[in-house]
């Protein structure tokens, strides 16, 4: 149809996931093949990139090897007269830790104000921009010996005030946490019984003034960070944030005021 596709060619320098596998003893051969690709009539080779396997680790030995492989290929291809506008390799961790940024960067989790790991450079001050909140859906007083939720794995030992919250595993409130808790009215409160698909039950102090529609903080500020949640379920912040489903409305703020609410359902 007379339209050329602009492409970015990926080099696999050690991630072993996707891309054109770069072998140390075949640099010339690989570069020649990429030159042939750049000359195909239907495409424009606009960019070339790689991805690091250990960018968020303190030990940079393997990352340095990947960087060497990538830069060697870039130089070899340029020497063959192939002009590429955008060379890029920096994810969030690489942006924080390394000086070589090439023509573009690919920030991911740092756009949400979260560090990729506890082994990266913390000298850049970033602030979390995302919180996961729910609402209280029910408040009840239960007598001692009452079972709660599926499987009856939790029984009240005394009279307890139990709050149901409108958040469950279908929303991204992970069932795999070892010691799940939330904050209600600034008070840390434990989840009791198994987390359900749409609801979860929370034990609150008997004297707490709590009512339906009160806010519940799952994660998102100094009280409980996404990293706290990730550690509690042997995961990483990336996974915890990605698990928040489309069932949860997105509320956008600017200068403390709601500017948009997006509900995908």
Q: Which residues are covered by each model-predicted region?
A:
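Active-site loop/helix belt of alpha/beta enzymes
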Residues: 3-6, 13-135, 142-143, 261
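C-terminal accessory subdomain/extension
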Residues: 141-265
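Internal, well-ordered alpha-helical scaffold/interface segments
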Residues: 134-137, 163
């Amino acid at each position: 149809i007379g339209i050329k596709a602009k492409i970015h060619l990926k080099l696999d320098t050690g991630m072993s996931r996707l891309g054109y596998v770069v072998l140390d003893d075949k640099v010339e051969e690989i570069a020649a093949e990429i030159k042939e690709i750049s000359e195909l009539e239907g495409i424009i080779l606009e960019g070339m990139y790689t991805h690091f396997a250990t960018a968020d680790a303190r030990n940079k030995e393997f990352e340095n090897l990947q960087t060497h492989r990538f830069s060697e290929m870039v130089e070899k291809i340029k020497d063959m007269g192939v002009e590429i506008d955008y060379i890029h390799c920096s994810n969030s961790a690489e942006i924080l830790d390394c000086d070589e940024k090439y023509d573009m960067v690919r920030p991911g989790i740092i756009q949400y104000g979260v560090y990729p790991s506890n082994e990266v450079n913390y000298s850049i001050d970033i602030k979390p921009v995302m919180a996961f909140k729910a609402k209280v859906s029910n408040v009840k007083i239960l007598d001692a010996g009452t079972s709660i939720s599926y499987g009856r794995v939790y029984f009240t030992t005394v009279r307890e005030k139990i709050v149901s919250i409108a958040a469950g595993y279908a929303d991204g409130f992970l069932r795999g946490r070892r010691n799940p808790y939330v904050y209600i009215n600034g008070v840390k409160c434990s989840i009791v019984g198994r987390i359900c698909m749409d609801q979860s039950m929370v034990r609150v102090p008997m004297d707490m003034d709590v009512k339906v529609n009160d806010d519940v903080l799952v994660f998102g500020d100094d009280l409980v960070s996404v990293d706290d949640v990730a550690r509690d379920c042997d995961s990483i912040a990336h996974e915890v944030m990605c698990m928040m489903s489309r069932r949860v409305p997105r509320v956008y703020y600017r200068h403390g005021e709601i500017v948009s609410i997006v509900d995908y359902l």
